[in-house]
Amino acid sequence: MKSFLISLTTILFWSGAFAAPPSLSVAGYPSIQAALDANPGKVLVVPPGDHEISEKIRLRGKGSGLAGAGRIIQTNPGQPHLEIEDAVAVEVRDLSLARPEGKNETRHEAIVAIRCRDLVIENVRILDNWSSAGTITLRECRDARISHCLVRNYMRISIDDRTASEDWGYAFRCTDGTAISLDRSSGCLIEGNRIVEERLVPTREVREQHGLGDFVKKNPVKGKIVNDVMWNADYSDAWQQGSAIVVNAPKDSSMTRLIGNQIENAAQGIDIHSDQVIVADNFVVNAFIGMKAMHGSRNVLINGNQFVRNSLWAIGLMPGTGADAGNSDGGSIVANNLISRFGEGDAAWIWGRERSPFKFDNGQEADDPPLRDVLVQGNVVDCIGEPLYRYAVIVAGGEDGPKGLRFDNNLFAPGWDGVANVELLP
């Protein structure tokens, strides 16, 4: 009798743990939008097959959504696929989103969510949305979840125009694109996604073909934070722009979890400009920067990640132009990360040999407060054969250099000049 009660309890628990799959279908309606408008607050099935659209699909209200094995093809490069705005508990599951051949390049997202709460985007496949915007973009959202999605080929050739900034003062050709972008959002979970770029990898041939890094415009006066060599050469090495995952707005973003994602061939793997962030159990493979936290990022826990074949840094912490006295960087932990095959990435030819697996840097402007109080423990830099880096760890010096860094119980394979450019204090 006791075992029967346990079994019955288990059945009841599991039957309640998973909601019944949606049964209402968009089939029979003139369009997916018409089906949503006729069924507010319902999650509708998009059946297998191709469903072409030329205008974005708008999801609003509470409890609406789309799910199913259908493929939504956006034929208009001037529109995203889905726009979710001022909504609560919207679900988007199991869909494929694509653009037709010849219309892949766009300046728009595939999914954009604005001022949403309890949003779920799960098991969605987004292929060949070549955009300088985030393929999945969340703005001013709370408690959203993006899980088990595939974003493949999200970059495009673009112009990064910094001529309006006194700090920079130039525009240049670049590759650009971000797979998942969070801006001014809190309480979000980004887990178990696969993000891969297979087209615009940083080879010499791709650079020459598109003139990547070449200035296309330059102000009469040199930017305040631009070095003379770059300015006079009319060329920037940093022509890989964008990130696989970026979290923006450190004063307005918090409680973000980036867990168990697989990232391949990104420019920057994970780019953090936020407070109270967990970056854990991710793979970042063949990015020129594995991850960085800057522009006033505080209380960032970087734990248990693997960084493979990164080219400039695997992990970098530093202030930036977004940092100020009320928005400083630090109070963070870097623990139990494994860095391997550093310097073997596709972008290694760009950056020379003054790179390092770990970089703790000073700010970009004189008034940037220094990075402070970071615990670095239990990390491994693994190197087989001759190292392709000068030091495993570089810590910037000077009055504005990092303060209060503590290193303990790490295994750092030395570079050709040693483990670090400074003594690493426990």
Predicted regions and their residues:
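Extracellular beta-strand solenoid repeats
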Residues: 45, 52, 58, 67, ...
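Short glycine/acidic-rich loop motifs that flank beta-strands on beta-rich extracellular proteins
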Residues: 53-57, 74-81, 100-109, 130-137, ...
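Acidic, glycine- and Ser/Thr-rich low-complexity intrinsically disordered tracts
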Residues: 170, 210-235, 353-426
